[in-house]
Amino acid sequence: MSFVKGDLLYVEHVIESIQTIKSYIADVTYDDFGSNHMMYDAVIRNLQILAESTQKISAVVKIQNPKIPWRDISGLRNILVHDYLEGIDPNAVWNIIKNDLPELQKQFAHIKLSLTK
């Protein structure tokens, strides 16, 4: 696979962010998540790192991995960074964590594997 120097680093940032989020919410209910502001802020910060890292991944890698919702992730970054004053829906964040991150983690593990061959 052809890639730009730095792609592997950014892919690793995505994977690390997902793993960190998973460690924060292990054995946590939605109610606990929504009421624990420190945990919520830590998860939001890692989602920002994840989204920011995907924006720095080269077009080559993005084209070779069209199943990843690159635009949606970029849009999430913009919401997390720019809409913080209006509040971010904890339910939406919880749904991303529970429904989207597991598959995203698999996809980025595959990208990492292909970049290290």
Identify the role of each PLM range.
Residues 1-117:
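Solvent-exposed interaction patches of small proteins and small membrane subunits
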